[in-house]
Amino acid sequence: MVDERIIKFIKRHHTLNLATVSAEGLPYCAACFYAYDNKRNRLIFTSDEATRHAQEMAKNPNVACAITLETRIVGKVQGVQICGKAERGDEEDKRQYIKRFPYAAVAPLTIWAIEPSFIKLTDNTLGFGKKLIWESKK
């Protein structure tokens, strides 16, 4: 079970920075709006199949992403780093995404979902450099 503090942080935000890697081993990142399904522990986002990151995910599903609170106050620094596998989303993922972003209902969507294997929350509000780590048992 993912720590409630991690879930709360993920649900409070809406943009993740996704990292993929090309067949040649070159990294790439893209910012994506996301919804989080805490029942299934999935980060859900859209990406056109023509984008570089979608093409890279189709060939190599291993991804990482970061969600951060932008602040200059050291005592308020918070962010998650996530590793996992990306896959094409299902109907439930689409419902969750549209629930979070209703305007997306009228757009042609290619839904993706990340199933995390590792999540690390750094939260300085709990103490300087305090980290909470969750790892999948799979």
Model-predicted regions and their roles:
Residues 47-51, 64-69, 92-104:
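Short acidic (Asp/Glu) patches
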Residues 74-138:
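Charged, gly/pro-rich active-site loop segments
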Residues 13-49, 57, 63-68:
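Short beta-strand segments
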Residues 23, 50, 70, 119, ...:
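Residue-level signature for short turns and capping positions that connect secondary-structure elements
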Residues 53-84:
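Helix-adjacent hinge/juxtasegments
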Residues 1-17:
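Extreme N-terminal tail/first-helix region
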Residues 10, 56-57, 97:
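A generic structural signal for nonpolar/aromatic side chains embedded in well-ordered alpha-helices
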